[in-house]
């Protein structure tokens, strides 16, 4: 704490004289076409300064508060050739720079909004569906390099809950959009589909269990030019998964001055020592290659763990003596044994990431009518996660190995690779794009600080007797116990080949018809690799008490066995048609249709109609209706694993089996089919003045036959049925099901205002509010084999899953951000509101509600000649979520904070960042 305070005091003293002297200059001018007519809504950006402006109806623009220095000024507008100019700005000076843009029919240059319309408008407010655009400057001011966390701070419709004691999800966290599952959001990179992560979230907070999302944190944050979030169903345009919407990550391109960013921070919070120290280093360079460019980026992240666990009042030594602990504060009143407290871990794990990315673009002629392009990246992550503590007298422990008990750890190795490339050309008025993309994500389960209790207390020699209980016979496993294991691997692969064509047609309507057609071929693969033998085998040894067989498999995560191992793939062919045009001078219409055929479950057709009506120049009404679908994930169809759950305070072996497994069929499992959806939205965009925009959008999403991980069939009746059916070693069964329908209703409100502040300052105010309510409208009944029995279950979904779908995400989310710029000085303040939510834990299902919380973030900084220095705080006032009261929701008072908290439970984070231009 003191070190952090000294650091920030020093930085403030360094900044103070600079803040007092902050002035900056102004760039202003006019944008016109070749004939001198003014061009409205052209984007003018001062590259390197992070400042931009939009031209008004007279073509005029002004960028104020520009730090002294030289900049490349870029002006661009859809339908015109982009233009750049080099300007030098002095302190307090005003520079005039006009642009005359030449018209072109179809441009291959990137534009401001890609998703939402194949016609590619330049302003989100012009679209018939809501799209948020977050620039690199906005992304870089959040005090974190985690893209998922950045999006959650900027877009209230996105949720990115922190995870702890959730197996692999501790290390690869998914995000959700509009309260749906991670796999209901399609992620694109430069307009190409991004592959999903290999991990299946069988344990997760803030979302329904059993989905696989996209690991946004595998992309270097410094390589991102902007992120576009389409908040509307788009399966008819982009294919499976786009039920909640689309996130398009657009990477930086072109020649630019090399940069290097270094950010360091630490959590300094009440009642806990400083922890979670983080260092992030990222940089990039872009240089010309012939007519084109090549950009290279790299990033390294090191984050120490955080721990918010309280001491354990049940932790006893061999004499049976426990510490005396205050249950209201978690403080140790009297230390009465020599055991280390806390013995649990409740917080972020250690994380180390290395990431690279490259983006290449080469026009093949001077007119820029044809080009080749390529982009891709590689990332590698190692980290830690934890399970539940195993006490010294647990049947999962051997005192000879862990005299004081042990806390098992996940040490995964995660690799992610992607590559894409293609050819674009303008041919006879057609804009053609032929390309391919390949991506893979691999997750290795390495388990440490654990053991396989069934192999006995021996590390040097084999002492497990096998199934017959007699050491020395032929069924002995013949291997000693271990303290670490390779428990297996999951890998996901995806190959996509696509051809897209677009043309502007004159059909006698008030404006040309934008026609887009295309076809795609996709091949997906999902593989489970078995762990080493010692990680899954049952050695047959009795437990330390000599009464019952010891639990088999590496404790906390039993390895994938050979029977779990599999390698499955499928293919998909899709074709689409997209038409957009103005039917009148005020009414724009967009119609899209898509047909897809899957090799494993069949065919699906979807459609979309979107309308935009503009009764006045500054007011737009918009609405859309679409059908969508999501194909069953390969991991949902073929995942198989026996793992350890804490159910009713006991360790139970739970079998997660494919739906075609006989143990699943006993309880009514059926072959998975596609989810189908209907999405309706309506709203308006209002720009009463050039510096203010307000949007309001209502939405309703109905999903039928939704796929989720069903209830755990593990009560006494289910166990008897399993035993009678020949599955005596299985304590419980879970499988995936299409067994429910859901309805999601909500509204998004956004507002942006820019005003002058003083002689040379600028104040940008932005607000965003999201309300989302999920409701389960249908649940399948109990399987016939359980109907009429004394089972504890009431449906194929348990209460924990129902709460996870309907209540574990705040209904209300809102942000209010103020950004002030004056010369070299810049500052940012944000107020974020997270509404109340509810959560429950397995078996006991003690549903608890937690109140809403308000967090404050702040950042100030100063632009030096070649560097930008910033300091800031996330959660400035050290706000924590409410504490669970029920014994089984707080793990007997060792997990003191709500597990499903949407903003985590790490407390205040202080950071400093320096951004350097290397010229």
What are these regions (language model features)?
Residues 192-231:
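Short acidic/polar hinge/loop motifs at secondary-structure boundaries
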Residues 206-214, 222-225, 236-248, 252-319, ...:
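Outer-membrane beta-barrel translocator/receptor signature
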Residues 773, 831-840, 862-919:
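C-terminal beta-signal and adjacent terminal beta-strands/loops
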Residues 400-402, 406-419, 425-426, 436-438, ...:
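Outer-membrane beta-barrel transmembrane domain signature of Gram-negative proteins
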Residues 148-198, 241:
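Extracytoplasmic beta-strand/coil segments of soluble accessory domains associated
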Residues 49-62:
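Short, acidic Ser/Thr/Gly-rich low-complexity loop/linker segments typical of extracellular
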Residues 96-99, 147-154, 175-176, 188, ...:
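N-terminal periplasmic accessory domains that precede
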Residues 32-37, 42-47, 76-78, 90, ...:
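Short, acidic, small-residue-rich periplasmic hinge/interaction motif at the N-terminus
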């Amino acid at each position: 704490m003191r070190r952090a305070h000294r650091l920030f005091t020093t930085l403030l003293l360094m900044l103070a004289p600079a803040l007092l002297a902050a002035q900056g200059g102004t760039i202003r001018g006019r944008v016109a076409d070749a004939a001198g007519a003014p061009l409205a809504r052209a984007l003018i950006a001062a590259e390197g300064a992070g400042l931009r402006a939009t031209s008004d109806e007279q073509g005029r623009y002004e960028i104020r508060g520009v730090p002294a220095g030289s900049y490349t000024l870029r002006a661009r507008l859809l339908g015109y050739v982009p233009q750049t100019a080099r300007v030098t700005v002095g302190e307090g000076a005003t520079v005039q720079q006009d642009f005359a843009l030449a018209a072109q029919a179809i441009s291959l240059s990137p534009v401001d909004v890609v998703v939402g319309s194949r016609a590619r408008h330049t302003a989100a407010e012009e679209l018939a569906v809501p799209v948020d655009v977050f620039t690199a400057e906005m992304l870089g001011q959040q005090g974190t390099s985690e893209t998922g966390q950045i999006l959650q701070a900027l877009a209230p419709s996105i949720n990115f809950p922190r995870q702890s004691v959730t197996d692999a999800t501790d290390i690869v966290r998914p995000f959700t959009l509009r309260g749906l599952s991670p796999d209901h959001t399609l992620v694109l990179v430069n307009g190409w589909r991004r592959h999903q992560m290999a991990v299946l979230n069988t344990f997760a907070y803030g979302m329904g269990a059993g989905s696989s999302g996209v690991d946004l944190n595998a992309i270097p944050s410094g390589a991102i030019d902007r992120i576009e979030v389409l908040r509307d169903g788009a399966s008819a345009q982009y294919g499976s998964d786009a039920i909640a919407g689309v996130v398009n990550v657009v990477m930086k391109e072109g020649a630019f001055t090399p940069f290097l960013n270094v950010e360091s921070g630490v959590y300094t919070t009440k009642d806990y020592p400083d922890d979670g120290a983080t260092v992030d280093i990222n940089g990039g360079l872009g240089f010309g290659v012939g007519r084109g460019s090549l950009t290279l980026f790299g990033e390294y992240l090191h984050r120490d763990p955080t721990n918010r666990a309280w001491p354990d009042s049940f932790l006893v030594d061999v004499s049976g003596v426990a510490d005396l602990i205050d249950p209201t504060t978690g403080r140790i009143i009297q230390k009465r044994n020599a055991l280390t407290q806390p013995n649990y871990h409740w917080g972020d794990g250690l994380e180390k990431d290395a990431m690279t990315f490259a983006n290449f673009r080469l026009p093949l002629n001077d007119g820029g009518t044809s080009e080749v392009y390529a982009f891709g990246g590689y990332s590698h992550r190692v980290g830690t996660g934890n399970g539940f503590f195993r006490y010294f007298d647990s049947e999962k422990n051997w005192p000879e190995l862990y005299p004081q008990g042990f806390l098992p750890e996940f040490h995964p190795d995660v690799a992610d690779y992607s590559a894409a490339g293609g050819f674009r050309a303008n041919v006879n008025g057609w804009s053609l794009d032929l390309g391919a993309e390949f991506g893979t994500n691999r997750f290795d389960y390495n388990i440490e600080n654990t053991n396989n209790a069934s192999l006995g207390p021996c590390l040097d020699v084999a002492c497990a007797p096998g199934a017959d209980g007699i050491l020395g016979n032929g069924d002995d496993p013949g291997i000693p116990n271990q303290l670490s294991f390779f428990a297996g691997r999951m890998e996901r692969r995806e190959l996509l080949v696509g051809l897209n064509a677009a043309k502007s047609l004159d059909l006698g309507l008030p404006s040309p018809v934008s026609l887009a057609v295309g076809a795609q071929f996709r091949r997906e693969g999902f593989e489970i690799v078995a762990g080493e033998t010692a990680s899954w085998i049952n050695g047959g040894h009795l437990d330390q008490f000599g009464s019952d067989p010891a639990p088999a498999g590496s404790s906390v995560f039993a390895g994938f066995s050979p029977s779990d191992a599999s390698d499955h793939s499928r293919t998909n062919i899709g074709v689409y048609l997209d038409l957009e045009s103005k039917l009148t001078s005020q009414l724009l219409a967009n119609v899209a249709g898509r047909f897809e055929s899957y090799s494993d479950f069949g065919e699906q057709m979807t459609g979309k109609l979107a309308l935009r009506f503009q009764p006045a120049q500054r007011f737009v009404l918009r609405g859309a209706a679409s059908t969508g679908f999501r194909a069953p994930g390969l991991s949902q169809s073929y995942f198989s694993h026996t793992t350890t759950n804490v159910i009713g305070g006991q360790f139970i072996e739970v079998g997660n089996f494919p739906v075609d497994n006989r143990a699943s069929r006993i309880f009514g499992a059926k072959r998975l089919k596609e989810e189908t959806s209907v999405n309706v939205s309506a709203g308006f965009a209002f720009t009463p003045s050039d510096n203010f925009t307000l949007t309001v959008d209502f939405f309703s999403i109905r999903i039928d036959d939704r796929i989720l991980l069903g209830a755990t069939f593990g009560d006494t009746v289910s166990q008897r049925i399993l035993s009678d059916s020949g599955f005596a070693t299985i304590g419980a069964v879970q499988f995936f099901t299409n067994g429910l329908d859901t309805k999601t209703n909500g509204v998004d409100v956004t507002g942006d205002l820019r005003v002058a502040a003083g002689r040379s300052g600028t104040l940008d105010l932005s607000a965003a509010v999201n309300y989302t309510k999920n409701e389960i409208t249908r649940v399948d009944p109990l399987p016939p084999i359980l109907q009429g029995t004394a089972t504890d279950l009431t449906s194929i979904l348990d209460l924990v899953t129902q709460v996870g779908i309907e209540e574990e995400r705040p209904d209300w989310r809102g942000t209010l951000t103020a950004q002030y710029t004056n010369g070299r000085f810049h500052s940012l303040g944000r107020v974020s509101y997270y509404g109340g939510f509810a959560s429950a834990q397995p078996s006991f299902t003690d549903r608890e509600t937690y109140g809403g919380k308000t967090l404050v973030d702040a950042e100030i900084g100063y632009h030096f000649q070649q560097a930008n220095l910033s300091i800031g705080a996330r959660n400035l006032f050290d706000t924590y979520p409410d504490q669970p009261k029920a014994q089984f929701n707080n793990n007997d008072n060792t997990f003191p904070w709500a597990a499903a908290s949407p903003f985590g439970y790490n407390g205040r984070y202080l950071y400093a960042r320096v951004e350097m231009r290397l010229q």
